């Protein structure tokens, strides 16, 4: 099924590509057909803030990780022009702003990974992944995700 038809079927809408918070490329092509998307935070009707295991629950964190992935996909679409060109989600790294005694970073990261699975299925949508607990993230956001995608060099 066409990725845009799949998104419509699932009720998934991409936001506008996120604004950058510094001097960097939002999405960088390298190695011929690989695109690295810089870290994206969640925006759900405005900014969200807090630390997992303190102000933010695992379930909220999963929603935020999904929102991060929507922003990643919006940045990727802006760079490549069409998500039908995506061949594979290769690798994602999810950073989770965590309280000292919080150890459920992988469960939080599942929110973003689940979206990729829903859109592209297991073979193309299940990436390798790291879920990393950190002390602080920019703007006090609870979750940030960066990703690497393999993209077809020919437009659909």
Residue ranges and their predicted role:
Residues 1-156:
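Short, polar/acidic, helix-capping and beta-turn segments at strand->helix junctions
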């Amino acid at each position: 099924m066409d990725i845009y038809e799949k998104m419509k079927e699932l009720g998934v809408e991409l936001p506008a590509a996120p604004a950058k918070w510094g001097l960097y490329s939002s999405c960088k092509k390298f190695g011929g057909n690989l695109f690295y998307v810089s870290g994206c935070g969640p925006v759900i009707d405005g900014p969200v803030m807090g630390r997992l295991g303190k102000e933010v629950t695992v379930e909220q964190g999963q929603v935020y990780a999904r929102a991060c992935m929507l922003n990643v996909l919006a940045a990727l679409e802006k760079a490549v022009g069409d998500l039908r060109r995506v061949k594979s989600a290769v690798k994602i790294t999810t950073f989770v702003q965590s309280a000292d005694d919080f150890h459920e970073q992988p469960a939080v990261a599942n929110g973003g990974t689940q979206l990729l699975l829903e859109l592209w299925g297991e073979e193309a949508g299940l990436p390798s992944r790291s879920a990393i607990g950190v002390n602080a993230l920019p703007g006090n956001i609870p979750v940030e995700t960066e990703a690497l995608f393999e993209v077809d060099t020919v437009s659909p």
